[in-house]
Amino acid sequence: MYRLIKQEGAARRGEFTTVHGTVQTPAFMNVATAGAIKGAVSAYDLKDLHCQVQLCNTYHLHLRPGDETVKKLGGIRTFTGWDGPVLTDSGGFQVFSLAKLRNIKEEGVTFASHIDGRRIFMGPEESMRIQSNLGSTIAMAFDECVENPAAYEYAKASCARTARWLERCKQEMARLNSREDAVNPHQLLFGINQGCTFEDLRIEHMKRIADMDLDGYAIGGLAVGEPTQEMYRIIEAVQPHMPKEKIRYLMGVGTPANILEGVRRGVDLFDCVMPSRNARHGHAFTWEGCRNLMNKKYELDEAPLDEDCQCPVCQKFTRAYIHHLFKAGEMLAMRLTVMHNLYFYNHLMEEIRQALDEGRYESFCQEHVEALGRRI
């Protein structure tokens, strides 16, 4: 469970203890959507990259290889070779973003698979059963992620439905955890705050789900096209109504600068595909900004990706070499840059935690937030 160690303004330094290990927070969760991080990075590499938590996706694993298959193979941690905590997303975001021909009812959602078009039904109970089969450390409640922008009345009705779905998720998880064949009988459940960019809906919904006494709480439905300042405004509105004794998770966020600002507003956990996705397109995160390795100026550059970085890649390889690998279409280019970016994000969190430990987080933010947002 969550323990608050120190606080500076709204920023929190803590630790989150689970059956699969203790997470030092604030922390970044490395995204392995289908059980692997894109870019040929395995669980074997993740310890060297200082990863604490891996995030896998319920929707994708349900479709392929199938959650029953993963259960037969010992659960997601045994299946992937990762022995630390794993969070599984509920599948809700993918149902509402990838799947076609959705039909939303009180029972749940019927949708067409983005792989083969077959019709699938998923509701709160189905999402919990799939995540129970996966045996993750943390399961996310099934919710509706409403498009942005959305009509106020639709967003209001969706919030109410998501809260009702959460009650069903909690009941089903209690039942599943009590089963003798549960992969992880200590599986935790996080609720998700929704409400688009409407402050009153966000606050009302957060108050309602806070009363359910869950293991943690997430802010969802942000970083989906709204201006960055809108996202910060919603976090500031919701944060005072989140239980102080529970861990807080901002879903799908974000850039290094977003993370600094999120921590400043009281967030403990983050996840984003950006470190691996940007790396696969030749973009390396550094303390000076995001470096585009496709640029010709790196053709003869013998410096590492980041001269202040201690990752395995920066200890051995040059910008010129990785630039060449991208131009030559070599897979190693993606692997090396993904490894660097994941290390950078995890090291950023280490620096954030140290700044909080030493009571200098605000000055740390002011020193780095502008540079981290640059493109170089």
Model-derived segments and spans:
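A non-catalytic, amphipathic alpha-helix used as a structural packing/dimerization or gating element
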Residues: 126, 130, 134, 157-168, ...
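Conserved, mostly hydrophobic/aromatic
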Residues: 21, 54, 89, 131, ...
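Glycine- and acidic
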Residues: 148-151, 156, 216-222, 331-334
